[in-house]
């Protein structure tokens, strides 16, 4: 049986927060993610999916968290817990190594980097939806960090906006198995039309390229 196909005219890969602070040894948040990320083979799988998308000329979009800058949040009346954590830890600090995209995942010319999101959803208060629609994208293959926060929030919002979502379940990670279970087994299945492995999506993209 042929694998599920992805029409590259209307499908894009969405890469969420591949920052050094998340997915590189020495990153501020890596130690919290390391156990689950390594068990899930998260980073190599993310790279495999990204390379497959590029090789098959699938459009690639990036949804990136706000890089911390001095003064961020200081005058806000309310700060969500996840924002407070980013503020206190200066996560993804602008101008630092941790705030850079890991080298293997750096966007190439022609790949679209949406405006940075301030909380969790890659869509909220950014131009991601506009960029996708202006490029004729209706279907998303989603991967990145963190499964129970930015990834889940972005998948939910994508469904609300009418996108058909495929979630790559072994190209993401959370702080614990419990949080991974909540994201991938409980919440995301309500919004993603398909939840697949890296091998499945890579095979699908390769199949499409041969047609």
Identify the role of each PLM range.
Residues 1-12, 21, 48-56, 73-74, ...:
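Active-site-adjacent betaalpha module
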Residues 14-16:
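Short hydrophobic beta-strand that contains or immediately precedes a catalytic carboxylate
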Residues 19-21, 28-30, 66-68:
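Short active-site-proximal "capping" loops at secondary-structure junctions
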Residues 23-39, 83:
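Acidic/histidine-rich helix-loop elements
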Residues 40-50:
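Substrate-engagement module of ASCE P-loop NTPases
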Residues 58-65, 168:
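Short beta-strand segments at enzyme active-site cores
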Residues 62-71, 77:
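Catalytic-core segment of enzymes that process non-peptidic bonds
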């Amino acid at each position: 049986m042929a694998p599920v196909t992805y029409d590259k005219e209307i499908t894009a890969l969405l890469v969420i927060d591949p920052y050094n602070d998340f997915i590189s040894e020495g990153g501020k948040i890596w130690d919290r993610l390391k156990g689950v990320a390594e068990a899930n083979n998260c980073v190599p799988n993310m790279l495999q999916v990204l390379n497959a998308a590029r090789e098959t000329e699938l459009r690639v979009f990036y949804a990136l968290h706000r890089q911390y800058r001095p003064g961020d949040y200081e005058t806000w009346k309310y700060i969500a817990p996840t924002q407070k954590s980013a503020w206190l830890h200066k996560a993804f600090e602008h101008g630092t190594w941790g705030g850079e995209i890991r080298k293997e995942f750096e966007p190439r010319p022609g790949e679209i980097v949406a405006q940075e999101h301030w909380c969790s959803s890659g869509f909220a208060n950014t131009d991601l939806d506009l960029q996708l629609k202006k490029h004729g994208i209706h279907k998303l293959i989603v991967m990145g960090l963190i499964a129970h926060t930015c990834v889940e929030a972005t998948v939910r919002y994508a469904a609300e906006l009418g996108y058909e979502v495929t979630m790559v379940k072994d190209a993401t990670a959370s702080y614990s198995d419990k949080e991974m279970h909540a994201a991938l087994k409980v919440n995301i299945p309500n919004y993603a039309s398909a939840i697949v492995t890296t091998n499945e999506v890579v095979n699908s993209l390769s199949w499409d390229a041969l047609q």
